[in-house]
Amino acid sequence: MASLIHGHAYPPIVEAVTEQLRRGSGFMLATECEVAYAEHLCSRSPSFEKVRFMNSGTEAVMVTIKASRAFTGRPKIAKVEGAYHGAYDYAEVSQITNPTVWGDADRPNGVPVAHGTPAAALNDVIILPFNNTQRALELLEEHAEELACVLLDPMPHRVGMNPIEPEFLTAMRNWTKTNGSLLVFDEVITYRSDYGGLQMALEVEPDLTAMGKMIGGGFPVGGVAGRADVMDLMNPKGDNYVFPYSGTFSANPISMTAGHI
């Protein structure tokens, strides 16, 4: 799933990481290798105005959802039925379910994956039928004033690796722009598809992108990149610091060094 795109023990990564280990593996402060890698990633995709690092794809998706809520002041998200987005309560709703609880094809049920998932989480996730543009738009309209974001995987592997239809994607982009919601891409897997992620081939720019796996050179990593006005919500030196976020090993120099190779 793209976590070892270079293969096992790729010599340049082994050499660079070994050298970095001699300097230090975790400082809990910004490092030169973090800054260099952030600048590199932002140069690869037009939608990446700023980037922030964490430790996994699950964490990255969680951050995009929380940032979307902080930016819009809205509680709900929308996602595609059957799409996998990691283990965060809201992201995993209707990820994998028994066919007996799917509900109507035109109005899929919000089904928990983990037993004990709070009902509130299910109520705040709107499930969209994949590539059914008309019905998806109708469902979005029902919750237009409450939706913080629409979360999409451009090629969801849990629904058969079927690519997203251009009509569906364009409709989601246009709807979010019109209604003040954010369009979020989960490119934890698909970022390997193009130099700047699958979004480059699709020619649609999301507001936020979640990344993981392949940007770490085989080491634990996650990343969120996107619009500066949204990313600035996490900037403690900014004027609109409403989403405090940090982590002990986030942007650690080992993952940054390996990822930048």
Predicted features along the sequence, with ranges:
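Conserved N-terminal phosphate-binding loop of PLP-dependent enzymes in the Aspartate aminotransferase
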Residues: 1-261
